[in-house]
Amino acid sequence: MEFVSMLCLFTFISLTLLLIHSIFKFLAFASKKLPLPPGTLGLPYIGETFQLYSQNPNVFFASKVKKYGSIFKTYILGCPCVMISSPEAAKQVLVTKANLFKPTFPASKERMLGKQAIFFHQGDYHAKLRKLVLQAFKPDSIRNIIPDIESIAITSLESFQGRLINTYQEMKTYTFNVALISIFGKDEFLYREELKKCYYILEKGYNSMPINLPGTLFNKAMKARKELAKIVAKIISTRREMKIDHGDLLGSFMGDKEGLTDEQIADNVIGVIFAARDTTASVLTWILKYLGENPSVLQAVTEEQENIMRKKEVNGEEKVLNWQDTRQMPMTTRVIQETLRVASILSFTFREAVEDVEFEGYLIPKGWKVLPLFRNIHHSPDNFPEPEKFDPSRFEVSPKPNTFMPFGNGVHSCPGNDLAKLEILILVHHLTTKYRWSMVGPQNGIQYGPFALPQNGLPIKLSLKTSST
């Protein structure tokens, strides 16, 4: 009885001290009367969305940083936001204080991709999904689909010959097909056209204003998203009936021990297609542009790739690529890194404050979005001298910590980056060893929204090399 009394007394004292601590913490926080970061919120509801997406993001960010400093507020895509532009602040949001900033997108994007997708979660559920994606996309797994990726690359390049192509659109088809083979394995061939039709409608509404009225891009996109989910459900049902174990991402999601619902699986499949397609296609488009504009770099990459072919001939090996070949491409890898830096396909990422947060002397209210500006960091002369210059040699030495984050940072960094680099290396190998290309039309323009792209998607003409070239 005495023990119970002591336990009750100890519990009471502990709770009292905890309450007093919480009160003092609240009063201390409130007494500071922290201001919001400087900046403007723009027009009601619309905010500064159009200013950001209709011009070079560097211009938007630079004008804000010049006027307000490295942290400022704005309003985009229906959300109040705080943008941060220093490597140290980005590390705090993405790594050091990641528990205070959950991954998020604007509500309209969550609805399109699916609220159960990996991007929007943290904790145990996120850890489980990340483990499953890494399991399917780790080197030991993706090396098995190199023949499939190579076949897609060869077929794609052959289809480009003799016609004027929009590089970005063609690369989207290539990366879409690679995404499907990595998610659905051999089953993708049966559903490719259905999936493509629905996804192409969905993507058109991705950056539209979230007005769900008949005829709007957003409304059409949401209908297409429902159809996509139905197709994925059909594939899941067929697999369960056949009781065949697949070594692809869908098989990983469907594992008996995982306990994922069909809705969770569908949301994450659609999310992975989104993550795997447009960004990688954008990188490939910029690579063709930068190689075309820098003959010495193109020559170095071509020589590296041709050397791989010569070694195979000398050793009597098949000319098909294998995993080891892709590890012998340091120059090409540096070109990819420099393209990721200069183009900065993803200008920023979204996080959300899970509570009122004191950050560098300012208040970030609970629920506000927080955007680390990768583009600003990648284009800062403090981090990369002559930042606008395309110079792959800068990656012969590692960049300073937290200054190069093309795939994000921390536990929410992109788990599919090995697959993305692999499919780029494979296509560049066949492109540089077999083809030559020329850019057509204006070459200095850039179009924005949602990704920065060469004007008109980089129109090019591709031709097969002859033995004399």
Curated annotation (Swiss-Prot):
Pathway(s) per entry: Plant hormone degradation; abscisic acid degradation
Tissue specificity remark: Expressed at low levels in fruit.
Pfam families for this protein: p450 (PF00067)
Cellular compartments per GO CC: membrane
GO biological process, one term: response to water deprivation
Induction: First transiently repressed (1 day after treatment) and later induced (2 days after treatment) by abscisic acid (ABA) and dehydration.
Disrupted gene: phenotype observed: Silenced plants fruits have a rapid ripening with a quick colouring and associated with higher abscisic acid (ABA) levels. When disrupted in fruits, altered expression of ABA-responsive and ripening-related genes.
Top class in the EC scheme: oxidoreductase
Location of the protein in the cell: Membrane
Binding positions for heme per the UniProt entry: 414
UniProt catalytic activity: 2-cis-(+)-abscisate + reduced [NADPH--hemoprotein reductase] + O2 = (+)-8'-hydroxyabscisate + oxidized [NADPH--hemoprotein reductase] + H2O + H(+)
Bilayer-spanning residue ranges: 3-23
Keywords carried by this UniProt record: Heme, Iron, Membrane, Metal-binding, Monooxygenase, Oxidoreductase, Transmembrane, Transmembrane helix
Enzyme Commission number(s) from the entry: 1.14.14.137
Cofactor: heme
GO MF annotation: an example: heme binding
Entries under PANTHER family matching the protein: ABSCISIC ACID 8'-HYDROXYLASE CYP707A2 (PTHR24286:SF249), CYTOCHROME P450 26 (PTHR24286)
Family statement drawn from the similarity comment of this UniProt entry: Belongs to the cytochrome P450 family.
Protein name stated in the entry: Abscisic acid 8'-hydroxylase CYP707A2
Species of the source: Solanum lycopersicum (Tomato)
